[in-house]
Design a protein with these regions (language model features):
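Short Cys/His-rich Zn2+-coordinating modules
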Residues: 1-4
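Conserved AdoMet/S-adenosylmethionine-binding subsite of the radical SAM
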Residues: 42-173
Length: 173
């Protein structure tokens, strides 16, 4: 599984964040996971080896983005346009971005987004029914070509039938 973490750290916003693995792991090393920082691998999608080939090669599986953060954090606003540019440049890769912050979507889009980039899937992360009922209706209104729902961490049974009937959700993880 290919992972690209352009920034690290997050701010807890819901019950699904209470036992966040990033906070636990960072605490083991004496780090504060609530401090958002750009990573050394920020430019991973466009890094090349000595032969001039991309280090991150196309695979059958997509590149998962921000597994130790949230792509739409306001603290990452200053870096996001550069991240979008790398995503656009690497049309040979498929990127999956999961978020609990669909409410920041329009504040964080590149100017040429239109109906979405063909190589980007956005997953709306939900953990309890109340959050699903809050986030998914707003998420369904967003201009995204490839939409999915991520049930993680799953804290209770979710009923998603009404959202799946729209035909806009391509996958539920």
């Amino acid at each position: 599984m290919a992972v690209w973490n352009p920034w690290h750290g997050c701010k807890k916003i819901s019950a699904g964040c209470d036992n966040c693995y990033v906070y636990e792991k960072d605490a083991m090393y004496g780090k504060n996971a609530s401090v958002i920082r750009r990573t050394a691998n920020f430019d991973l999608p466009v890094k090349k080896n000595r032969r001039g080939e991309y280090k991150l090669l196309p695979q059958e599986e997509p590149v998962y983005v921000c597994m130790t953060s949230d792509f739409f954090l306001p603290e990452a606003d200053e870096w996001r346009s550069e991240a979008w540019a790398m995503i656009k440049e690497r049309q040979d890769l498929s990127f999956v971005i999961e978020t609990k912050r669909e409410h920041r979507f329009f504040k964080a889009l590149p100017g040429d987004w239109g109906d979405g980039y063909e190589n980007v899937t956005i997953l709306c992360s939900v953990e309890i029914q109340r959050r699903a009922d809050d986030r998914i209706p707003a998420f369904l209104k967003l201009p995204v070509r490839h939409k999915g729902i991520l049930c993680e961490p799953l804290l209770e049974k979710l009923v998603l039938d009404a959202y799946l009937k729209t035909g806009e959700i391509a996958q539920v993880l």
